[in-house]
Amino acid sequence: MKKIEAIIKPFKLDEVKEALQAAGVQGLSVTEVKGFGRQKGHTELYRGAAYVVDFLPKVKIEVVLADDMVEAAVEAIVSASRTDKIGDGKIFISPVEQAIRIRTGETGEDAV
């Protein structure tokens, strides 16, 4: 099993969710996050004072999948979230040792 973490622009969330569902992903978690990378921040003016906005709003999507679903899920995320502009986001893939469904006690891929 693998865990995919994708950090994307917030307005792309619905498109990515629909693309993942079309690829067969049955569940995901979403967290609102803030961060910066090459996109950096920007300066804004508020009541005559300039201030730097270092952290930009993003959305983090997390899914745990069987190994054979990872490629399709990554393709779905990339195709749905790409704008070809700086700040499109990142995807991280990590191994998952075990998953347990609390309600039933199922383990491994059956729990996902």
From Swiss-Prot:
MF term (GO), any: ATP binding
Database matches in Gene3D superfamilies: 3.30.70.120
GO CC term (a single one): cytosol
Annotated positions of the O-UMP-tyrosine modification: 51
SUPFAM superfamilies: GlnB-like
A Pfam family assignment: P-II
GO BP terms: nitrogen fixation; regulation of nitrogen utilization
Keywords recorded for this protein, A-Z: Nitrogen fixation, Nucleotide-binding, Phosphoprotein, Transcription, Transcription regulation
Superkingdom of source: Bacteria
Family to which the UniProt record says this protein belongs: Belongs to the P(II) protein family.
Subunit field text: Homotrimer.
Role, per record: P-II indirectly controls the transcription of the glutamine synthetase gene (glnA). P-II prevents NR-II-catalyzed conversion of NR-I to NR-I-phosphate, the transcriptional activator of glnA. When P-II is uridylylated to P-II-UMP, these events are reversed. When the ratio of Gln to 2-ketoglutarate decreases, P-II is uridylylated to P-II-UMP, which causes the deadenylation of glutamine synthetase, so activating the enzyme.
Protein name (record): Nitrogen regulatory protein P-II
Native source organism of the sequence: Cereibacter sphaeroides (Rhodobacter sphaeroides)
